[in-house]
């Protein structure tokens, strides 16, 4: 009977241990599924989930929501010239610069894909968004990352598309994201190394 009881308790203990290990594994898998493997910041899936939540919150509270799309200028040339190891290191460095450029708990920096990053800034006006952009550009200038094959400069630079909205039921979040992407395209068209902010009244481009 004692042996049976010991065996039974051992079985329970083992089962609990296995359940705990499974729970840890599930948390790790959940973490990995939302984390970009290279830069260790949020990935596109995490961005999409967060964007849905913040859009609905901004719509309900009638508060401004800012999106930014950032692209590293002439990154293919950087990669081809320096090799993929340095290219990966560059992506990691930019990711960390972006993370340090925002500080509030709900601000999100994610890798959108390739050399493109996206930022969600809840409760952020256009004026405040410009301050964040300027901080990002200054930090990248200070980092002084060599890019000898860039047609612009010997330093790495970035282009950004930025837009702020107070969403209503009439607005569509995917259409808004496309507008931000269009601003990024305009920033590239107008010489890169800067940003475009667009609203119903004006288009603004400031070279860094």
Where are these regions (language model features)?
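Short beta-strand edge/capping elements of PAS-family sensory modules
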Residues: 3-4, 64, 193
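PAS-family sensory domains
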Residues: 1-11
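A short pre-motif secondary-structure segment
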Residues: 108-111
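Short regulatory alpha-helical coupling segments
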Residues: 30-31, 44-64, 95-103, 122
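PAS-associated C-terminal
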Residues: 8-10, 70, 122
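Conserved nucleotide-binding and Mg2+-coordinating catalytic segments in signaling enzymes
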Residues: 30-49, 70-84, 92
């Amino acid at each position: 009977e004692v042996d049976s009881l010991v065996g039974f308790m051992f079985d329970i203990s083992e089962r609990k241990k296995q359940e705990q290990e499974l729970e840890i594994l599930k948390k790790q898998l959940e973490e990995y599924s939302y984390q970009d493997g290279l830069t260790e910041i949020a990935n596109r899936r995490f961005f999409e989930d967060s964007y849905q939540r913040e859009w609905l919150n901004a719509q309900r509270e009638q508060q401004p929501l800012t999106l930014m799309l950032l692209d590293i200028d002439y990154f293919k040339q950087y990669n081809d010239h320096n090799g993929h190891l340095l290219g990966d290191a560059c992506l990691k460095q930019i990711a960390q610069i972006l993370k340090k450029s925002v500080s509030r708990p709900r601000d999100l920096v994610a890798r959108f894909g390739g050399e493109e990053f996206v930022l969600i800034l809840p409760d952020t006006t256009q004026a405040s968004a410009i301050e964040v952009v300027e901080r990002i550009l200054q930090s990248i200038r200070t980092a002084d990352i060599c890019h000898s094959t860039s047609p612009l400069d010997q330093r790495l630079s970035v282009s950004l598309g930025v837009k702020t909205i107070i969403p209503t039921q009439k607005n569509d979040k995917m259409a808004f994201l496309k507008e931000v992407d269009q601003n990024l395209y305009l920033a590239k068209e107008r010489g890169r190394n800067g940003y475009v902010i667009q609203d119903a009244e004006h288009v603004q481009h400031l070279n860094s």
